[in-house]
Design a protein with these regions (language model features):
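Membrane-proximal alpha-helical anchors
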Residues: 1-98, 351
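Positions within the helices of HEAT/ARM-like alpha-solenoid repeats
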Residues: 9-16, 34, 66-68, 85, ...
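Hydrophobic core/packing positions within alpha-helical solenoid repeats
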Residues: 75, 93, 115, 119-122
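Short boundary motifs at domain starts and secondary-structure transition points
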Residues: 45, 126-127
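Surface-exposed acidic, glycine-flexible loop patches that form ligand/cofactor-binding
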Residues: 62, 127-128, 244
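Tandem repeat scaffolds
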Residues: 131-369
């Protein structure tokens, strides 16, 4: 290859290298420009959100209801647009509710619309952005509200909330998520809790008289000394629930599941216990008051009936309807069965009877008379 040809090739290579370098530099410049534009847009958006947040919070302090409502809904929109600000806004709305619902509404008045709106926003929020936020509505007066009902088919999310002493009488909470929520000493009289999830919730000394808990999930819930008289607990899932000294008198527990539940000292007098599963409630029914209860078809497999009604009446099972009840493995040691009607129970053995107290008035199944 002659010298001229070599010079030509070198020139081509140099030109190509310069072109590549130029393209690379242009690309770097373009990328830097894009990054800068992106940062500027982010800063602009952040500034806009800050301005929107400031305006919304300012509206919460307005005298007019419609302005305050606008502030609540503006905060909801910011919460949706900026997950980073989610927990801050949730805390603002919770504080707003506690401040504006610290006292009961005037007689004949409902919970204010702005408080109800803030409650709905919190109850229907995307809890995956909660971070360390925990809903705190202690002692708030929220009776009669329809939490989350403004959003069709979206149940309220109140899991792990602190609702101690909250006034929720007549509140509609159907299908709400209240897992591990603290409702101790709360007022839930006549509340609608149909199909609500209350597993591991704390309901210690909670007033649930007349509440609807049909098909509710109360697995391992804590209901010590809870007021449940006249409550609708049909088909409720109460496996492992703790109900010592709870008042269940006159309640309807038909077809409920009370496997391994603790009912020590509970008052179930006059309750409908048809088809209830008491399997393995070995420490459960001890000392409970079943006077006048209907246990037709109930499963008492392995349940401890040895001290049922002892603290309440001298003849524990008189008046208790046991038609078709399954007593397989039930502990009847020293149980007072005098005057009891056991003629239609299932799986009762002579060994169980020999450990209990009976008399001439005790009616036994055929074959055990």
């Amino acid at each position: 290859m002659d010298w001229a040809r070599r010079v030509e090739l070198v020139s081509v290579l140099v030109a190509s290298a310069v072109a590549v370098a130029g393209l690379w530099y242009s690309n770097v410049q373009a990328q830097q420009a894009l990054d800068q534009a992106r940062q500027e847009r982010a800063l602009t958006k952040e500034g806009q959100i800050t301005d929107r947040y400031t305006a919304a919070v300012s509206n919460l302090g307005a005298d007019k209801m419609d302005v305050r409502l606008g502030g609540v809904y503006a905060l909801e929109r910011i919460m949706q647009d900026s997950p980073r600000d989610h927990s801050t806004i949730a805390n603002v709305l919770a504080t707003y509710i506690r401040l504006h619902a610290a006292r009961p509404p005037a007689q004949g008045q409902d919970v204010p619309a702005d408080v109800n709106a803030a409650l709905t926003v919190l109850a229907t929020r995307d809890s995956s952005h909660d971070g360390d936020f925990r809903l705190d509505l202690r002692s708030a007066w929220l009776s009669g509200t329809e939490i989350g009902r403004q959003v069709p088919y979206q149940p309220a999310v109140l899991a792990q909330a602190d609702l101690r002493g909250t006034h929720l009488r007549g509140t509609k909470l159907g299908s709400a998520d209240l897992r591990a929520t603290n409702l101790s000493n709360a007022d839930l009289r006549n509340a609608d809790l149909t199909s609500t999830t209350l597993s591991r919730a704390s309901l210690v000394k909670t007033d649930l008289r007349g509440a609807k808990l049909f098909a509710a999930d109360l697995r391992h819930a804590f209901l010590t000394e809870a007021e449940l008289s006249g409550t609708d607990l049909r088909s409720a899932e109460m496996r492992g629930a703790r109900l010592p000294r709870a008042d269940l008198s006159g309640s309807n527990l038909e077809d409920g599941n009370l496997r391994s539940a603790d009912l020590e000292g509970a008052d179930m007098s006059g309750s409908n216990l048809k088809g209830v599963d008491f399997t393995s409630a070995s420490a459960g029914v001890s000392g409970a008051n079943l006077t006048g209860a209907n246990l037709t078809g109930a499963n008492l497999n392995g349940a401890d009936l040895s001290t049922v009604n002892k603290e309440h009446h001298g003849t524990p099972l008189v008046g208790v309807i046991l038609d078709g009840a399954n007593l397989e493995g039930a502990n009847l040691a020293d149980a007072d069965l005098t005057g009891a009607d056991l003629s239609h129970v299932k799986n009762l053995t002579r060994k169980q009877l020999d450990s209990a107290r009976t008399d001439a008035e005790t009616r036994l199944p055929a074959g055990l008379s």
